[in-house]
Amino acid sequence: LIGGAARRYTCEMQDRNLALEVVRITEAAALASARLMGRGDRKLADHVAVEAMRVAFDAMDIRGTVVIGEGERDEAPMLFIGERVGAGWRAGASDSPKVDIAVDPLEGTNLCATGAPDAISVIAIADDGQFLNAPDTYMQKIAVGPEARHVIDLRESATWNLERIAKAKGKKIQDCTAVILDRDRHSELIGEVRQAGARIRLIGDGDVSGAVMTANPDSGIDVLFGTGGAPEGVIAAAALKCVGGELQGRLRFRSDDERARAVRMGVKGEDTIYSTDELARGDVMFAATGVTKGYLLDGVRFFGDSAKTESIVMRSKTGTVRVINATHHFNTKPKYSWATGLEP
């Protein structure tokens, strides 16, 4: 009994340590990309975020496999789908946890490049084989916080869902706010939400942060509607699972090639509605660090030889949500990005 209790205690401490270690990954990416805020080069901002995150993984005691990242092996030099990350692989340590990794080193590349709010760096971690291997295509989504969990249905109209969400939260539709990506494809959706009487916050990029905001009462966001990236849908589902929220998603293919690729990956077709637990199964962890100041997190602030970051770390097993404000001293911190001109 004592031995079993000790093993359970050890596993629990490893899980807790891992939950706190993941934020170091997003901090590294945020610190690197924030140097390029407002400088108009979204590709370079994304590149340095990817580079910094990849290097930071080398110090993490895991055997991780990227299942959602920067694309296929021939499309991305780092953090490609199937890449092994973590110190555990190099050491051959069988006791290092084997996990799935879902990352977006810089969600909102355009936001960072223009200095707009809500660019973030995000990561989600689950046990091996627990994330949906979402293809790089679109996903129609609806996301809500805990109060409106189990009352939404992606098959129904936005108006129908708004009525149910408002009732669940004890408010009128006119008091509800929906966050929607500002895209031409959403013109009818935006018109319907306006006709229903709800308020709208249009965002240029970043529906992961939009989905997470539905679970934060201080954000004023009640629901996310619309179609965005399928990989981002899995990451957002992991985040909402940690706090008791809900995301439903349905794949939307843009071409026959995308449809065929999904079949090869073993993913179900466009008629399937994926629940939160189908997108992110088991115990999951989520972390995000702000790059630019936003509604979800504060951005990176530089002070010559140091910088401050704000991050959020969540874990589904315990429901714990931690907000971490950190000060980073560049004269002692590892250098995660070697991109020209980014030295502090």
Residues of each region from the PLM?
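Helical "lid/coupling" subdomains associated with nucleotide-phosphate turnover
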Residues: G204, M213-D218, V223-P344
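N-terminal subdomain of lithium-sensitive/metallo-dependent phosphomonoesterases centered on the IMPase/IPPase/PAP
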Residues: Y9-A102, K167, V208, G282, ...
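Acidic beta-strand-loop-alpha-helix segment within the catalytic core
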Residues: V122-I203, M265-G266, G294-Y295, G299-R301, ...
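Short, low-complexity intrinsically disordered segments enriched in A/P/G/S/L with frequent Arg
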Residues: G3-R7
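Short acidic, glycine/serine/threonine-rich loops at helix termini
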Residues: M78-F80, A113-A116, A134-T137, L189-R194, ...
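General beta-strand structural signal in soluble alpha/beta enzymes
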Residues: V66-E70, I101-V103, C112-T114, N133-A134, ...
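Solvent-exposed alpha-helices and their adjacent loops that cap or buttress functional pockets
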Residues: D58-A59, V85-S96, D104, C112-A116, ...
